[in-house]
Amino acid sequence: MEELALDQPAIVFWMHHPGELTRFDRLEDAVHSVMLEPSAKLFAVAWIKARDRHIEMEEIRRIQRLSILASHLS
């Protein structure tokens, strides 16, 4: 799996409100917003469209973990 650029634009499609979406200038901000949802650690609450890629909850969680790890190491 290729590495994602966290500074690319992204759109979050919320599952709990069909048709609702939120645009972000940075993929990292989109991931953080999704993970702020109380049930995001257990359930699929959204998916993200970034450039030509569809990102499901499992990958959103992985990106968040890597982002947290990178911030602690820097």
Regions found by a protein language model. Give the residues of each.
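Short aromatic-glycine-(Arg/Gly/Cys) micro-motifs in beta-strand/loop hairpins
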Residues: 1-19, 48-51, 62-63
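Low-complexity, intrinsically disordered short peptide segments enriched in small/polar/basic residues
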Residues: 9, 28-31, 57-60
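Residue-level signal for functionally critical sites in structured catalytic/ligand-binding pockets
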Residues: 12, 36-37, 45
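A short, exposed loop/beta-hairpin motif centered on an aromatic-Gly-Thr core
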Residues: 18-26
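A broad, structure-centric signal for solvent-exposed, well-ordered loop/edge residues
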Residues: 19, 31-34, 55
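A short, charged, amphipathic alpha-helix used as a generic interaction element across diverse proteins
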Residues: 25-40
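Short, mixed-charge low-complexity intrinsically disordered segments
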Residues: 40-74
